[in-house]
Amino acid sequence: MYIFKLMGQNLTASQSFPYNIGPIVTGYVGKSIWTLHSGTKKEDGSAVSIFSFDIKKNPSKLEVAKNGFKRAKTTRHPNVLKYLDGLETETNIYIVTEPIQLLDELLEDIRNFENAISWGLYQEGLSFLNNKCNLTHGNIQSSSIFVNKGGDWQIGGLDFVSDVKDINNSILRNHNDLIPNKYKSPEIMKSQWQQIQQSPSYSIDSWMLGCLMYECYNGTMTKAEDIKNLDQIPKQLHQAYQKSFAVKTESRLNPQKFLESPYFQNVFVETLVFLENITLKDTFEKEQFFKKLDQHIEKIPINICKFKILPHLVTAFDLGPVNPRLLSTLLKIGSNLSTEEYNSRIVPSVVKWFACDDRALRINLLENLEHYIQHLNEATINDQIFPHVVNGFNDNPTLKELTIKSMLLFAPKLQEKTMIILLKYFAALQKDQQAGVRCNTTICLGRITEYMNEATKKRVLIPAFSTALKDPFVPSQNAAIQAFMFTISNYSLEELATRVIPEVSRMLISPEKSIRTSAFTAINMFLQKIEKNVDSILPSSPQQQQQNGSTLNTNPNDPNQNSQDSMLGWAVGITKKLYSGENSPITATNNNNNTNTPPINQNNNNGYKSPPINQNNNQNNNQNNNQNNNQNNNQNNKSLQNKQPTKVIHDGWGDNDYQEPPKKQTTTNTPSKSSKYKVEDNDDDDDDDEDYQEEDYSKYKEDLPRLTPKPSSTSSSSSSTSNKLDNKPMSLVSKNKPKYSFDEEDTSSSSSNIVNKNNNNKNNNSDGWGDDDGWGNDEIQVPSTTTSNIKKTVEKKTIVTASKSDGWDDGWD
């Protein structure tokens, strides 16, 4: 029955112990009568350290263990190991403390920080025991000193704490054999207990404190004689060190006096002592302290910064105004916290700081964002921080730029709806008065593209970068070109050909060489992508298929037929796009190879040569054909003029108010052998010379051909693309009758635009991002004629349209 009763008691005790005992700390084995375990609290899983004593295995040491258990529960001081809980059973004694580490295992790392050892030796706890409690510790050594998570040295091993003057107290007298001899004072070694009773309570501890000083700078003592070696001991410590080993017990170092030693007069100790008493300091003292703290923070171990300095800094910011520059120090320290610790200790304060009106504090928050952004989760950023951050877009220029730059770090964690809000702010910032703000907005927009969804990219990127191209600020133009290049993977081939390249090509004639260079580089990149991928996405055109079919019906063994077919195919393709008055080499070739023209027989049956073909008749026929074509075109153009465009095109980023000035350029038309309407740019002044040529040109001004590339194997692809583009209704050049006059030496370049200036401000009702199709409402700008003779004909009502068979190009022959 006794056995079952004992088992029941042990089971009840085990169930009532609210801690999980973990593995043994091997570094502590053999250094104490206690066994040290790591453990956790059952309720919340928080870490603890547990000392256990096995009564059955060490019955002779039970008195010492019970004394240590009692002193641990009753001694409270910041420098004494913090007692959390304990349990005594029939078989074991448990002491639960805060999580700790062994000083022996940390000394190597502590020595790397100047004056860090001095903070450990600044032992107010020992002075408290000796002078306030009149107790002797009796076991001061490196194995009885522990380090908590805040880097503070804690006094443990309270097994021999007693009043040595009490005759009835026999703990130290009866069990001093458990203390290594190298740490014992001479009077203990000689068992001079009567002398000990007459000595100050600190006499034994002072000797052991000197031994601890030695081990901190030299390592573990091997014998008592090692204390005579002062080579590694700092000079500021020599006097106190030597006094600890005084022969007379009353002359030994008092721990209270030791705290006043010059050895502790350093920044490390002064900083930590001030923080421990910061609640007693006035505002001026706090301000002076915080100014100096940033200069010395790197000299303090990280654990001390995290758990001792950081809490005081957070409290200082929450309670009152402090130097905002100190925020960088706080955030650097906080970056070493885990995500859970950061969310509980820093994030609530960060949210509060972003909401404040102190510009200096908000600037520092943005400047140091990289130190804490990784600890902020998406919900916190989108719901609590972002609504306050965007207020910086409406603040002074400094805050605007910092807020824009901060979006590079915020963007990966923004939700879709938050990203849309951000892009609306960016649309407004592209029209900001500050040039630097506009430029940085474009750069930032290009770099956060990867965090947008596909629909947003299609709707925003091209209008946004096109707006930046029109910015008179050169860096903004360059930023837009670079952004187009950086985001090339987000554009389809059709978008590159019809929207991106036309916008960037305007920069080819920029007055700034750097812009021209960037534009050439960008366009080459776009063209390479189109050339590489266009054949894989466009089907063959019906013309190409018909041409392939006609090739199959020909006789491959007839070289003359092949030659004629190839030449006729070229001629037919050109005549569909060109008018008869141009490209004389082609016309001549057609006349020579036309199968309908009777051959010239040089030797006939009558013995005389047949007359040559009348070239004048051919020219007259060509003239009549041109006139008929002109009449038909005029009728078609008039019908188109009466039609209203089905859709007004406008980009959502503002009107196209940027127009390059016309460049001086001389163009020469190639003379035609088959047409009598030869247009030559020889009229360089305002006189009436060569008026017949100007009149002819004015009469047939609408017959000017558009430069068409030579047909090749890819003609079918290009024609297919042009058909797709031609389906979009073209806007009229002008609804009124604008009159333009050009100086004779101001010939229009291929990139100049003839657009009614009164329409520049129309349709400026964008919501910031354009219509759903991504184009907006800008009118399409058509290329103008490029001859100086236009000054007599431009006053006429002119409608420029693109037929399905004609391709747009960049100049004139």
From Swiss-Prot:
Keywords: Repeat
Compositionally biased spans, kind Polar residues: 548-566, 664-674
PROSITE patterns according to UniProt: PROTEIN_KINASE_DOM
UniProt HEAT repeat ranges: 340-378, 380-416, 417-454, 456-493, 494-532
Organism domain of life: Eukaryota
Keyword Repeat: yes
Amino acid composition bias (Acidic residues), ranges on this chain: 681-695
Region annotation (Disordered) ranges: 539-566, 583-790
Compositional bias segments (type: Basic and acidic residues): 696-705
Biased composition (Low complexity): 583-606, 614-637, 712-722, 748-768
GO CC annotations, alphabetized: centrosome
Domain text: The protein kinase domain is predicted to be catalytically inactive.
Protein name: Probable inactive serine/threonine-protein kinase scy1
Organism, scientific name: Dictyostelium discoideum (Social amoeba)
